[in-house]
Amino acid sequence: MDVGSPEAFSESGTLGVEEEFFVVDEHGVPTAGSDELVYEGEPPEPIAGRLDHELFKFVVETQTPTLNGVAEAPAAIREVRAALVAYASEHGLRIAGAGLHPGARWREHEHAEKPRYRSQLDRIQYPQHRNTTAGLHIHVGVDDPDKAVWVSNRMRWHMPVLLALSANSPYWNGFDTGLASARAKIFEGLPNTGLPTAFESYAAFQAFERRMVEHGGIEDRGELWYDVRPHSGHGTVEVRAPDAQADPAVVDAFVEYAHALVTEYAQRYDDHPDPFSVTGLRRELLDANKWRAMRDGHDASFVARETQGAVDLGTVVDRECDRLGVSGIRDVYDDVSGAQQQRRILDTHGEKRLYNHLSL
């Protein structure tokens, strides 16, 4: 049975970054290429052993090595991307980044042959058949399993903030959805996604994970696709809310923010006299804020966590930067959002320019 172990949670502050990308042709149009890149070729360092298939044959995922902290992340992210772009170029292919590719029509593309994905397609059917999404996943090491669950519970409020800042997928299946992040809505069609309820302890989380596997809800722990989760294999808190990005500086900002959040909450846990007191974060409120994020992107406002009324994204960003000593998310917020950029480019210059804009 593929479930994790509390012993995996042994290191604090380590970092790993997983990015999903689209394989495109010379014109920036999605094309099958993952088999060629993953199985038929020999990926170079630093992506040897860290390049994998995703559900569709035009989507791949990269992983950085385990990093000792956030300071190492920008260089590692760029080294992985440069290696992937060069490797794809050798095969006559290019790489693009976004939550959804505006030129991808899911009925026109093949799914991967990997048995795990074939099993998911059989079990989940339509929601997985149309799942052309690409995301950014950030792992931060936590040295205690109960602490990882406590941190994950509190991280839930911040996932709509990350989603709003990252919103980079207005187009799906050839049309404008009217959303800033259609990826988030498409992905929520799968089971075991979105913002989870709070868990009382690691034992409660592990019992849930084991029960889901034993009774056929999932085949392995990796199919708990929540926006944030304790990863019982890597010993991390994994943040899965953001859309994928073409610009590595935007990825840097989200990595900095996620790492700072996990680090700060981990310290709070160590200082807290009653670590598993009630969090006060209702799932319904979190879902409402996620909807605002996926619909409005940078223009989102959120139901306030501890007071009456709403708070706009800009105010949240200012408070978080001041509280945590980070700056990247302010730069992201001050810039035009990914969704807005895509719409402006398509309206002004057309598809060809948009596809080039999304290419690495």
From Swiss-Prot:
Entry's EC annotation: 6.3.2.2
**InterPro entries from the UniProt entry:** GCL_type2/YbdK_subfam, GCS2, Gln_synth/guanido_kin_cat_dom, YbdK
Gene Ontology molecular functions: ATP binding; glutamate-cysteine ligase activity; ligase activity, forming carbon-nitrogen bonds
Enumerate the catalysed reactions: L-cysteine + L-glutamate + ATP = gamma-L-glutamyl-L-cysteine + ADP + phosphate + H(+)
* Keywords, in A-Z order: ATP-binding, Ligase, Nucleotide-binding
First-level EC class: ligase
Q: Single Gene Ontology BP term?
A: modified amino acid biosynthetic process
Note one Pfam family from the annotation. Answer: GCS2
General function of this protein: Catalyzes the synthesis of gamma-glutamylcysteine (gamma-GC), the main low-molecular-weight thiol compound instead of glutathione in halophilic archaea.
The family database entries (PANTHER family) matched by this protein are listed as: GLUTAMATE--CYSTEINE LIGASE 2-RELATED
Q: Which family does it belong to?
A: Belongs to the glutamate--cysteine ligase type 2 family. YbdK subfamily.
Instruction: Name the chain's protein.
Output: Glutamate--cysteine ligase
Report which gene this protein is encoded by.
Answer: gshA
